[in-house]
Amino acid sequence: MDSLWGPGAGSHPFGVHNSRLSPDLCPGKIVLRALKESGAGMPEQDKDPRVQENPGDQRRVPEVTGDAPSAFRPLRDNGGLSPFVPGPGPLQTDLHAQRSEIRYNQTSQTSWTSSCTNRNAISSSYSSTGGLPGLKRRRGPASSHCQLTLSSSKTVSEDRPQAVSSGHTQCEKVAEIAPGQTLALRNDSSRSEASRPSTRKFPLLPRRRGEPLMLPPPVELGYRVTAEDLDWEKEAAFQCIKSALQVEDKAISDCRPSRPSHTLSSLATGASGLPAVSKAPSMDAQQERHKSQDCLGLVAPLASATEVPSTAPMSGEKHRPPGPLFSSSDPLPATSSHSQDSAQVTSLIPAPFPAASMDAGMRRTRPGTSAPAAAAAAPPPSTLNRTLGSLLEWMEALHISGPQPQLQQVPRGQNQRSQTSRTSSCPK
């Protein structure tokens, strides 16, 4: 026992570990293991190779004798075991053979143990209900049989391969029995489910025994639907659509500006103001023309009526009509009507009137001219005709009927200079 905890156990990487984990072994086996580890029991092991370890310990890591050094050496940090580090040198073939044999044994054991546990899969599905009673009765001999195989495998056998093969055959028999048991259990479970009463609280169709199955009558309308009803429904739908469209059109028309009425009103105001506007440029042109005729002493009654329309458009370009009377969208009708109205006004002027009387009447009505200049340029009263009163009355009637337009203001000094130059050039 001292050798287990002594330096001999420390020489082997798994010695201390296995001695601590296997307290259930018999004392004789413990002594044999200690002798194997110390190297003193090698001849005994050669003499009696049939002594085997407990098969339950084969799942642990195999032990290596003292003669065969391990391929791994432990690294110790602070007295504790740490991961093993491989030692230098080639691995021995004996270790490979032993490990392959142990792996084969482990796989065989796991195969038959897994086949034994697979038989209880159905009982695990009924774990919530505690399992079926028939299942427990049938499971009894199978479980005892499996326990017998385990106990027999735990016993020490003389030759290991025969024990392993016997365990394989026993487990194969158990596996052959297991499918039939599962089929029988499934049949029992289906029969038990069929024998269970229905637990639905509210049946789908109320039915009594001995009465035929009657379906409820279908839903019926309170009135009869005819083709007229369908036509009325279509008309009502069309009316709803039309009313919606009319409301939309009305809203769109309300949002649009009232442009046509505005243009008509502007045209009407422009037509009413055209005669008054067109008279002013023609009068200005006639005033200049009559001034030149007064200086020369010539009277041409027909020439004034024929030449003024040609000069009227040019005077119209100089004197722009005021903005509020015309719309910006239609300037061409205003100019054409302006020229036509100027021609009409010039044709309305009486031809036999002398130039001096016309000039005097225009100067009297013109607000821009000064009084001294008008008095200097005015001819003596002896040259006026009898029709001067009628001309003045006609001019006053024109001013009363139409608004007086705002004429282009000529600078005062320039107007006086032009008048003085013209009067000085006239023969005295």
Curated annotation (Swiss-Prot):
Disordered: region residues: 1-23, 36-204, 254-293, 306-384, 402-428
Q: Where is the composition biased (Basic and acidic residues)?
A: 44-62
Q: Give me the stretches of Polar residues compositional bias.
A: 118-129, 144-155, 260-269, 326-347, 403-415
Task: Write out the transmembrane intervals.
Answer: none
Tell me the protein's name. Putative POM121-like protein 1
What the entry lists under PANTHER family is as follows: POM121-LIKE, POM121-LIKE PROTEIN 1-RELATED
Q: What does the sequence similarity comment in the record state about its family?
A: Belongs to the POM121 family.
Quote the biased-composition stretches of kind Low complexity, using this chain's numbering: 106-117, 416-428
- Which gene is annotated as encoding this protein in its UniProt record? POM121L1P
